[in-house]
Curated annotation (Swiss-Prot):
Belongs to the class-II aminoacyl-tRNA synthetase family. This is Asparagine--tRNA ligase. GO terms for biological process: asparaginyl-tRNA aminoacylation. GO terms for molecular function: asparagine-tRNA ligase activity; ATP binding; catalytic activity, acting on a protein; nucleic acid binding; transferase activity. It comes from Lactobacillus helveticus (strain DPC 4571). It is an enzyme of class 6 (ligase).
Amino acid sequence: MTELISIKDSSKHVDQEVKMHVWLTDKRSSGKIIFLQLRDGTAFFQGVVRKNDVTDEVFEVAKSLRQESSFYITGTVHEDARSHFGYEIQITDLKVVSNNEGYPIGNKEHGIDFLLDHRHLWLRSKKPFAIMQIRNTMFKATVDFFEKEDFIKFDAPIFMHSAPEGTTQLFHVDYFDHDAYLSQSGQLYGEAGAMAFGKIFTFGPTFRAEESKGRRHMTEFWMMEPEMAWMHQDESLDLQERYLAYMVKQVLDKNEYELKILGRDPEKLRPTTEGNFVRLPYDDAVKMLQDAGRDFKWGDDFGAPDEGYISEQYDRPVFIVNYPTSIKPFYMKKNPDNPKEYLCADVIAPEGYGEIFGGSEREGNYEVLEQQIIDAGLNLEDYQWYLDLRKFGGVPHSGFGMGFERTIAWVCHLDHIREAIPFPRLINRMQP
């Protein structure tokens, strides 16, 4: 019996007759030969229909196929050194499932607004396909890494009574007779999980009502947020470095084909897999910018151009450590050697991509945290449960958050974060 296979498994079936179910992405003909560009969700490759190898009926059906028609094929797999994929199939039989005309995304240049309007169909094209395959590898690498490190997956709520970083940039929701907000972060609940299970990570959607059209901002995006009991900041930085190195190595090992589709040079990513990330104090980063003639003073937060400049000085991610307390959230622990600083760090991706991780050692002292909540102008009652984590068995603990789409954008070398998620939600876009 002829085996049904996927395109990605073609290398295991060279010179064998196989069956596949596929979609047509493009077609061209040279008289007695029809070249079909095919996809099946696992890869893209070429099918060849020769008039002398098929019945007249099959050849006429092949001639009639339109873009994104779907059909079953039978044929023999051969090597094809000319293609990115390396294989093609000589088709001997073909049965159509659907063959409608008018597919809106033709094989020509389209503007980004048109493509986003048709995102439900654009996902079928090569570039989105490659990005989503890499996204999937990075997701699986994340779960694999943290399982090996004895973390458990911990789910935080989406509806929040209060926000971990104040009440700005929040989506308000009418929650029966109460006010609620869409989550900006699962961190505070993750800390509760860490006190119960030791090491946890949350992974889910977060929401920020940022009125920004910048290339690094969306209103809905995914965050991966580990929290670790009994862990200090330096240990957390070591963990972050191992994790990022592991995740990028998985992409290099498993997504060579997709990186080729994107034109992404894998050698630009390889230094990250070696670790040894520089730990650059905030003070030194300020001096770096000032020495470069930039208008930046101590106490300012880094903007995207500042982070971009810093990242371009390194061939791998860099930690910027110990920011001023005035520009970071209330839950961080102050540096005992300099109370004007928090024990915190942001990971800045190379090649101008800027911040992708942010983390800190968390303040573990009840009285100190209580005062920091008050100083931040927050309602103490909203955070009483959070203070209980310190009151009852509080321990030193640390955590960080990774912006998943920002990290994907860097790995894939994308111009805009909107391409790193299947259906982007932007200030001016909620459909499809």
